[in-house]
Amino acid sequence: MENNSFIFTDGKDPKMIEAYKKAQETFKYFWRELSWEYRRIVPGLNIACVKASFSEIDSDGDKIVEHMWMNDISFDGDTVSGYLINEPNDLTTIQPGDYFEIPLNEISDWLFAITPMQKKAKGFSKLFSSSAEPIPKAYGGFTIQKMRADMSESERRDHDEAWQLDFGDYNEIEVVNEQSEKPENLIEHPMSRNMKEDFVKFLEEYPNELTNIDEEGFTLLHRETIAGNLSSVEVLLEAGADKHLKTNKGKSAFDYAKQLNWEHLIPAFEKN
């Protein structure tokens, strides 16, 4: 990511406010992807970050606001946490590397990018295939896409070249990998489907994982629910995970399923 890329955004622009809301509503897909990224031996994401606003009052009593990116993101169902990436332009009380916790309803954007899998050329088509690495495809980036929509075609090309990302069509913002080719990925992450049998075996070998509770009151069922992983949630419930257990904030896994609007999880809780 280019340092300080599009830090400032117009908080009074209705379309920018709409972009903020879209980012907040769809953040769950970002977190779902990141929940699997943290389990991968070989990283699959080129970039994964969240944008939020940061402010302070200057010596004249005026409020200074900058929108900047954080990475190393964590999420507990309510709060997004991470470390500041950008160097502020005007803010003086924060710096890159500072840790922040931001309520989900206060983030302004999220972005992740994945390098598309290259299909191997066969036969005659090999003569016309390129050996160049494909450009990582961006997902999310609602405020970025709003700004791209306001640019001329040449400005968009320069912008995308600076980021070295394929942002696609600003009118069709995708939130999950291969969304156009595999719309079923909106319902469940492919790794969740593919790992179901392995997860069953894992719980058979480590049954204590069903009942382990961390210092904040979260169980594995809470975590998998927040990430929207249907197969994992089904396996946990069928194995006897207690869906009534509440975190220190007083929320059950089912509460998080409803709060984050993971519609595909709700029948699993009602059934078990």
Task: Please provide the spans of the model-predicted regions.
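Ankyrin repeat domain, specifically the short helix-to-loop turn at the C-terminus of the second helix
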Residues: 201-209, 234-242, 270-272
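Ankyrin-repeat boundary/"N-cap" motif
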Residues: 180-189, 211-220, 246-252
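Short solvent-exposed strand/turn elements
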Residues: 80-102
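Short coil-to-beta transition motif at edge beta-strands of beta-rich domains
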Residues: 37-62
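Short coil-to-beta-strand transition motifs
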Residues: 60-71, 75
